[in-house]
C-alpha cells in the first residue's frame, strides 16, 4: 500500500474512533452523578448526563462547586458520557 493510502486509512480509523459512542463500561463514574447547580447564584447554561434517560440534558449551573457531571457544551457531554 502506498504512503498516501496508509495516511488515508489512518485518518479514517481516527475519525471512526472519535465518532464511536462511549460504552457504559468506559463511561466515567461522575456521569452517574445528578445535576448539581452548586451554591452560587449565577445563571450559566450547562449540560449534564442523565443516566436514567441515557442522554445529555441542559440545566442551570450557579457558577461554583457542583460536581464533575457538568459540561459547557452538549457535544462535550455526549463525547464524555453518552452511550
UniProtKB/Swiss-Prot annotation:
Source species, domain of life: Eukaryota
Keywords linked to the UniProt accession: Disulfide bond, Protease inhibitor, Secreted, Serine protease inhibitor, Signal
Record-level GO cellular component terms: extracellular space
UniProt keyword Signal present: yes
Disulfide bond positions: 31-81, 40-64, 56-77
Signal peptide positions (record): 1-24
Keyword Iron on entry: no
Predominant localisation class: secreted
Cellular localization per UniProt: Secreted
InterPro entries: Kunitz_BPTI, Kunitz_BPTI_sf, Prtase_inh_Kunz-CS, TFPI/VKTCI-like
Residue stretches in coiled coil: none
Annotated site location: Reactive bond for trypsin: 41-42
GO MF entry, a single one: serine-type endopeptidase inhibitor activity
Domain BPTI/Kunitz inhibitor: residue ranges: 31-81
SUPFAM superfamilies xref list: BPTI-like
Function (record text): Serine protease inhibitor.
Protein name from the UniProt record: Blackelin-4
Natural source organism: Pseudechis porphyriacus (Red-bellied black snake)
